[in-house]
């Protein structure tokens, strides 16, 4: 049976091209494929190719393999006895566009080497590792024998790291010295005991040192950062230099007498300005002011130049200095740090700080915050206060000078606030003269004044920008409001028009219904051939020049005429009807509408004028 007999010429041509391209010998399958695709030759060929790819993908795949690494003398034997699967190399240009993966590829030597290395790294031989390293080195976590002080030790790579770590854990400072060997650590004692307990410990310590030939002990200090400040009293240059040292084995030679002196009570039995163990910072500061006044401003003459010490905690002093509600009252912050063991403690306070010029300038231009660091505990507390207040510069200089240059105290540090950060401008040492102190204080006032002027200028510019932005935003909002109002008005107008159209349409519908109702009550017009004695002819003069003719029977009522006009859209509530008499008579007012035309002697021919009310 010839399957192509029922096909059209173009279909037979497409069938021929399809079978030639796809090598499909089954004409029934070919015709079915083309017919299912509405004889679209391109889609049929594409469907055939996709089916071929699908059949190819279902073939078993030859996976790429990575040979295992061979080791030792068995490498050749294992490689020869191992079954090597066939690997098919397919070039990229040989792959059809519709295929998304390669059948397989050969394993390169680099990949084999990489895998071998990974396998070797993953092998762990506990027995060989422990046997090779056990005799030469200590096991991890094993105890390292402790060396006696003064014994020379040959450093080894394995012991240097642990010894450095243990050494760093035993670091000390001059404020908290490390006790020597065979001596129990000293417990903190109150500085108000006038050195009684510490003196006895000092004697016992000296007795223990009589058998030694050295009069100095090596005390490790904190090696992380070494700050060196130029605090020579003979120089006027107050520049600060900070040096960094990374050596963890640094030591500082400290004499025993100096170590004991740091922990002893106030010199000469004086009452400390800030006692140890105070209950609150405010009480400590008030005690400082009372002791300072008793020492240096006890007479009426000196009381007039008493420095205006601030007696609230440091956060309150910072707020008073830099965050006053009135910007005109904002001032730099001045720290006065006293140290009773300094040789300048009395001279600087009486001759410089309590002088008329210095005290007056501080009273009007600074917020003066005092503290006493004679006691180590008070020094540590003050350093903590500075750290909490983010005043690292002040903390650094006070800490370093307290450890190395006590004669630099009393210290006056000038601090300003710039861009939400605190900066140390300068500091006055206990060896400075009144003129030098005045120069530095005036310089601090001038610098903070410049900072305030810059901040005020920036604040004004910021306020102007904000004002412009607010104005633009207000104008934009006003424009949006106006646009919204116009849109609402337009929407309202459209809504009103819609309602008006609906009303008119409704009225027209009602009028149409009314007309139909009224027209149903009007009798039929008599024919023209009716006797003249039985009919009347009425001519209607309509608004806008229109005319109409109608015949009525004489026995019909005048209401019939009114109903006829109403059916034409001229209802009596909107129009008036006048006859042709002179003067004109309104029909609805001068005639009884229930009477017929004969009773009212209506003329055989009448003309009615219809006028809009």
UniProtKB/Swiss-Prot annotation:
Expressed in the germline (at protein level). Expressed in spermatocytes but not in mature sperm (at protein level). Expressed in the spermatheca and nerve cells. A motif (Interaction with cdc-48) lies at residues 582-584. Gene3D superfamilies: DNA helicase RuvA subunit, C-terminal domain, Glutaredoxin, Phosphatidylinositol 3-kinase Catalytic Subunit, Chain A, domain 1. SUPFAM superfamilies: Ubiquitin-like. Residues 68-82, 158-169 have a biased composition (Low complexity). GO terms for biological process: cell differentiation; ERAD pathway; masculinization of hermaphroditic germ-line; positive regulation of mitotic cell cycle, embryonic; positive regulation of protein catabolic process; regulation of protein localization to chromatin; spermatogenesis. Residues 67-223, 453-472 are annotated as: Disordered. GO terms for cellular component: chromatin; cytoplasm; endoplasmic reticulum; nucleus; perinuclear region of cytoplasm. GO terms for molecular function: K48-linked polyubiquitin modification-dependent protein binding; protein-containing complex binding; ubiquitin binding. Residues 137-149 have a biased composition (Basic residues). Ubiquitin-binding protein which acts as an adapter for ATPase cdc-48.1 and/or cdc-48.2, conferring substrate specificity. Together with ubxn-1 and ubxn-2, plays a role in hermaphrodite spermatogenesis probably by promoting the degradation of sex determination terminal factor tra-1. During mitosis, ensures the degradation of DNA licensing factor cdt-1 and the disassembly of the DNA replication CMG helicase complex by promoting the dissociation from chromatin of several of its components including cdc-45 and sld-5. PANTHER family: FAS-ASSOCIATED PROTEIN, UBX DOMAIN-CONTAINING PROTEIN 3. This is UBX domain-containing protein 3. The gene is ubxn-3.
